[in-house]
Amino acid sequence: MNNFLRLIGRRLVALPIMALGVTVLVFFLMSFSKTDPAYTALGDGASPEAVAEYHEKYGLDDPWPVRYVRYMGNLIHGDMGTYGAARNSVAKRISTALPVTMQLTFIGLAIGAVVSFLLGVIAALYRDKWPDQVIRVFSIAGLATPSCWLAVLLILLFSSYLKVLPASGALPHFTTNPAGYLGRMIMPAIALAFPLTGQMTRIVRTAMVEELDKDYVRMARGAGVPEKVVVGINVLRNALITPVTTLGLKIGYLMGGAVVIEVIFNLPGMGTAILQGVQGNEANLVQGVVIVVALAFIIINIVVDMLYLLINPRIRTV
């Protein structure tokens, strides 16, 4: 138990250190941008006097460590700066975009988890038989299929040809229009989940096969314990530790994929926000989106790591 608490403590201590490192790195790299925020906000025709006044007002001529400390002070209070001629709030833009990205990520994760666990268990139970062979082909296809390419195929099939699902348009709120919400999110989620499903199916199958070949399983079967009890209680519980951990670590990968998929399907998430920032030379918006995505990735992975410590009895009982 003491070992468990010590491991948890290490991860909690690592969180603020990693978060600080991310903000330093992103801010430092963005300081090399040749885009002048003054011209972005005031327009290309701004006079030198107006540009100088803008620089003076926002401290753009200060050394980057000074600007970083000021930025962090504002960030702690929820102020990530502004973007555009209208001085829109970066924090407000991210607050509307981040939930969309997280929803797409976890819908894709749920689809990938359910399908891969079912297929992996079936493939292991029917090892080297036709269900196993079919599932192996499916998993290879998933590994070989890029999400972007699958997204285009889904749009061509379900939006252009069958005309049953929308490929763009507003994203309805789930509570007011659940059918419209699911219809808008299902294709992006499938495109995001398919490669993950292929990989996780192989991992689940391998873990199940290794567990089924262990001596305690043979002894339980020899003692007359029903197969459902052996597989459902003992084998699954032990075999799924590694797949669950791997699945958790894939959340960051899915977030990165979701950012790209959102652009293809024109979803109002972080991908669209960062594209808007790049196209408009909005350094504050790009910087804010990158920092938030990186921090979300770090937090999720540390939480998953802590959950792994909880579900792994060998660590929990030390």
Segments from the language model and where they lie:
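Transmembrane helix irregularities
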Residues: 33, 142-145, 255
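Alpha-helical transmembrane segments of integral membrane proteins
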Residues: 2-7, 98-131, 147, 176-318
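Juxtamembrane/transmembrane-helix interface segments of polytopic membrane transporters
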Residues: 22, 26-30, 151, 155-159, ...
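Membrane-water interface segments at transmembrane-helix boundaries in multipass membrane proteins
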Residues: 87, 137-202
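Residue-level recognition of pore/gate-forming positions within transmembrane alpha-helices
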Residues: 15, 45, 113, 140, ...
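An internal, D/E-rich "acidic patch" concept
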Residues: 1-4, 61-117
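N-terminal signal-anchor/signal peptide hydrophobic helix marking the start
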Residues: 9-19
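Hydrophobic alpha-helical transmembrane segments of membrane transport/permease proteins
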Residues: 18-69, 83, 162-184
